[in-house]
Amino acid sequence: MAQRDTGGGQQRTGRRDDETAEAEVEESGASDLKERHEKLSEDVDSLLDEIDDVLEENAEEFVKGYVQKGGQ
């Protein structure tokens, strides 16, 4: 009986290449995500610092405005 070559060896190599490519994409995606997270964290920290500065300067006005609007 004749045996057929299904090219299985090439498919295995293709899978390894695909896995390597996927790993590279995941690594670059993870580094992009990390950079984005750091940038957003810096932005949030900056905004919170700005809010703190405003509250320190205008704390009394802030409290009066809050109470007048129905805050407790």
Swiss-Prot record:
Region described as ARC ATPase binding: 28-66
Instruction: Describe which pathway this protein belongs to, using the record's wording.
Output: Protein degradation; proteasomal Pup-dependent pathway
Which residue positions does Deamidated glutamine occur at? 72
Please note every region of biased composition (Basic and acidic residues): 32-41
Task: Tell me which stretches of the chain form a coiled coil.
Answer: 22-61
Gene Ontology MF annotations: proteasome binding; protein tag activity
Keywords from the UniProt entry: Coiled coil, Isopeptide bond, Ubl conjugation pathway
Keyword Coiled coil attributed: yes
Any single GO BP term: protein pupylation
Q: Does the keyword Coiled coil apply?
A: yes
How does it get modified post-translation?
Answer: Is modified by deamidation of its C-terminal glutamine to glutamate by the deamidase Dop, a prerequisite to the subsequent pupylation process.
Covalent cross-link site, Isoglutamyl lysine isopeptide (Gln-Lys) (interchain with K-? in acceptor proteins):
72
Q: Where is the composition biased (Acidic residues)?
A: 19-29
What does the record note on quaternary structure?
Strongly interacts with the proteasome-associated ATPase ARC through a hydrophobic interface; the interacting region of Pup lies in its C-terminal half. There is one Pup binding site per ARC hexamer ring.
Q: Which NCBIfam families match?
A: pupylate_cterm
Q: What is this protein called?
A: Prokaryotic ubiquitin-like protein Pup
Origin species:
Parafrankia sp. (strain EAN1pec)
